[in-house]
């Protein structure tokens, strides 16, 4: 779905669950302002074709449940970075794994990057487990400076294009994850020529159910 200014309010709503702040690099008092800055930065990145943000919603209820970002690294040419936020009510339902699938796929197949890096909080055991299970390589802990001072401890994970094609694509096919051909074309068009001032539309990779 489209990246819009109103998504700042959505992220603020998610943050009202105290558990949310255990897994993001913001502190509670700064959430409203930083949530707005977060969306402003996402829109600016889209306009400059540096990063692409998508919000995923439930097919059943239409409720927005998560956000995933694919961004070209500012520091290293040929490398992309993936980040995501999942609404607390949607935790432990497998969405983080699906978002990671999509983020990796988008970076390798649409942005044509040679490697993708994903950071996870050192204390976030669930995220670290997912990334290791998908075959990303841990590069060890690092310090991440916080806007309000101090730092957080992060684990950085990396996967190369060859590893994605050899290891992860067969796993995606075995688990019957797929993107319809029409949506592949839409995603490619968005990556090559995103509209100014707003996000595009895409269907997150979904589990295809065989007809009974």
For the regions a protein language model found, what residue spans apply to each?
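Acyl-donor (CoA/ACP) binding surface of acyl/acetyltransferases
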Residues: 1-18, 53, 57-212
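Conserved GNAT-fold acetyl-CoA-binding loop/helix
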Residues: 19-41
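Short, conserved alpha-helical segments within structured domains
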Residues: 27-31, 52, 123
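Short loop/turn motifs at secondary-structure junctions and domain boundaries
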Residues: 44-49
């Amino acid at each position: 779905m489209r990246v819009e200014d109103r998504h700042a309010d959505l992220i603020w709503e998610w943050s009202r669950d105290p558990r949310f702040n255990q897994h993001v690099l913001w502190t509670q008092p700064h959430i409203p302002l930083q949530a707005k800055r977060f969306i402003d930065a996402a829109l600016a990145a889209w306009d400059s074709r540096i990063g692409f943000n998508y919000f995923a919603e439930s097919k059943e209820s239409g409720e927005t449940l998560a956000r995933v970002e694919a961004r070209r690294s500012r520091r290293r040419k040929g490398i992309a970075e993936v980040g995501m936020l999942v609404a607390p009510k949607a935790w432990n339902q497998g969405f983080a794994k699906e978002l990671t699938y999509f983020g990796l796929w988008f970076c390798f197949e649409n942005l044509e990057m040679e490697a993708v890096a994903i950071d996870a909080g050192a204390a976030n055991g669930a995220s670290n487990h997912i990334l290791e299970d998908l075959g990303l390589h841990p590069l060890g802990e690092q310090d991440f400076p916080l806007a309000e001072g101090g730092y957080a401890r992060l684990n950085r994970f990396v996967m190369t294009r060859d590893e994605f094609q050899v290891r992860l694509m067969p796993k995606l096919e075995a688990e019957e994850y797929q993107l319809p051909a029409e949506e592949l074309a839409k995603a490619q068009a968005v990556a090559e020529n995103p509209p100014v001032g707003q996000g595009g539309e895409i269907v997150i990779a979904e589990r295809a159910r065989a007809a009974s």
